[in-house]
Amino acid sequence: MLATHTRTVFYISDGTGITAETFGNAILAQFDIRPRHVRLPFIDTEDKAHQVVRQINHTAELEGKKPIVFTTLVNMSVLKIIEDGCRGMLLDMFGTFIRPLESELGVKSHHRVGRFSDISVSKEYSDRIEAINFSLDHDDGQSHRDLSGADVILIGVSRSGKTPTSLYLAMQCGLKVANYPLIPEDFERRQLPPALVPHRKKIFGLTIDPQRLSQIRNERRPGSRYADLVNCRNEVAEAEAMMRRSGIRWLSTTTKSIEEIATTILQEVRPERLQY
């Protein structure tokens, strides 16, 4: 179903606004609307809060609809100005979750701006950077070195979604992910590439509908044999047959988001070292 109407959506924070936008997008994805996104970060003074109120109210007047306003504001005086003054539908995420938790836990939260992504809190930041570097070094079969250090190894035909999934797992979960493209030489051998065999338990396969694969490849190399539908059908069939013979778990990425693919991989492979 196509989106039926538009609505301006504000994401307001005294930090970067990334958390507000992430939560907001997750919620809005449940509705058939076409949002116009406006992120307003670093709203950390009362003067800035009054400017935000004017911007929201101007938008409401122009469009004749209440803008949707997601906030992750720690500063209560700033939040109150926006709550009291704006003519939008305000959804205060921190207020929704933090204040009930304070009551239940019997302790006050830190009320620190940017606490969610504070890189000084622990060594998780450096671990994630290390995971990203590992995943880049081992992208598309570039390196077979230190595969024993990989948490997950993805295999599949070219353009089946291995690279974006690898980077998502590295950035969001701190996992070291290698990925390897299955090519005609692998199909001729009818078995996994020798370098991957010792790490079979870490391997997860991605496949894709041949017609969709042909469309994706045509965007990259239009009219080529690489993008030809018959070739795509053959490659996908060979890859799936190899994964079945080798006992490799796999899924089709055709209609799935990166988040859905990554979650399935985590459930199936269950890597020991996992950060959220």
From Swiss-Prot:
Record's catalysed reaction(s): [pyruvate, water dikinase] + ADP = [pyruvate, water dikinase]-phosphate + AMP + H(+); [pyruvate, water dikinase]-phosphate + phosphate + H(+) = [pyruvate, water dikinase] + diphosphate
InterPro entries, per database record: Kinase-pyrophosphorylase, PSRP
Keywords of this entry: Kinase, Nucleotide-binding, Serine/threonine-protein kinase, Transferase
Keyword Nucleotide-binding assigned: yes
UniProt key word ATP-binding: no
Any Pfam family the entry gives: Kinase-PPPase
Transmembrane segments: none
Binding of ADP, residues: 156-163
Family that this chain belongs to: Belongs to the pyruvate, phosphate/water dikinase regulatory protein family. PSRP subfamily.
Name of protein: Putative phosphoenolpyruvate synthase regulatory protein
Native source species: Acidovorax ebreus (strain TPSY) (Diaphorobacter sp. (strain TPSY))
Record lineage: Bacteria, Pseudomonadati, Pseudomonadota, Betaproteobacteria, Burkholderiales
